[in-house]
Regions:
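Short acidic/glycine-rich loops and adjacent helix/strand connectors
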Residues: 1-260
Length: 260
């Protein structure tokens, strides 16, 4: 699948000329799908056509963490539907040339395609435009290329990754699952919970510590309270609007009570 909230940037000779998110053109928040209009905008702003592009970089590399993926499949034995879904997604992302040919007929793609591991792309996007020449960078989200977090030291043109948190543990999944449980079902509703949090009381602090907790090399989830690691959680984007199925398990309801 082409995931939610896609954006495009157009650097020319090392200088950023244009950047845009597809949702700004589609007028659908977190629009999910191939970002044809954002690409067209960036090409116009840069004064070039698709055939003039030298390098096409994508924030996903299916080859990243491949041994981790194989090990998880062998040890955890996830549902066949979950495995097939991941394979379909990888195949879809590999078809970028076909997507561009449909969106820009008559403009052949001559650029080399560069696959950038998900969290390395996040780190690059913040460090490269920061005022610092040396900094510690941390990337935390749901999942990308079988990892949910990465951190390292960046210096000059060198982007270092010293460690990662791998699937199935994820603070993004933890936050999204609790957001769903609290009655905010839409993708991206986490900001609403964040805004409401200062007005609440830590009544369930002890219970929540069972869901996510620190370990020696990072953090882990209490996996019995989540579904994503053992079965396929539906992800759809009807009309461009992303929707993710329920991430929490029945055990979470037993711990915290009925969903709100």
């Amino acid at each position: 699948a082409w995931v939610k909230a896609h954006g495009v940037t157009a650097p020319v000779d090392g200088r950023l000329i244009a950047a845009a998110e597809e949702e700004r053109f589609r007028r659908i928040k977190h629009w999910a799908g191939f970002p044809t209009q954002a690409i067209a905008y960036c090409l116009r702003e840069a004064g070039v056509q698709l055939r003039d592009v030298d390098c096409l970089a994508m924030n996903s590399d299916p080859r990243a963490n491949v041994l981790r993926k194989v090990g998880f499949a062998l040890l955890r034995r996830p549902s066949p539907r979950l495995v097939l879904d991941r394979l379909r997604n990888a195949k879809k992302r590999a078809s970028i040339g076909e997507e561009l040919a449909r969106a820009f007929p008559g403009q052949p793609l001559r650029a080399r395609t560069l696959r950038v591991e998900h969290h390395l792309a996040h780190i690059a996007s913040c460090f490269s435009v920061s005022p610092f020449q040396r900094a510690v960078a941390v990337s935390v989200d749901g999942f990308g290329d079988f990892a949910s977090a990465a951190w390292g030291l960046c210096e000059g043109q060198t982007l270092g990754v010293a460690g990662r948190i791998h699937f199935p543990h994820s603070l993004g999944i933890f936050y999204q699952a609790i957001t769903q449980f609290l009655g905010f079902p839409n993708y991206g509703d986490e900001y609403k919970v964040m805004g409401l949090a200062p007005y609440g009381k830590p009544s369930f602090a002890r219970e929540l510590r069972q869901l996510a907790y620190p370990v020696a090399d990072g953090f882990e989830l209490g996996l019995r309270y989540f579904r994503h690691h053992r079965e396929r959680v539906p992800y759809t984007w009807t009309g461009g609007t992303p929707h993710i199925g329920t991430l929490y398990s029945d055990e979470l309801c037993q711990l915290l009570g009925a969903p709100r």
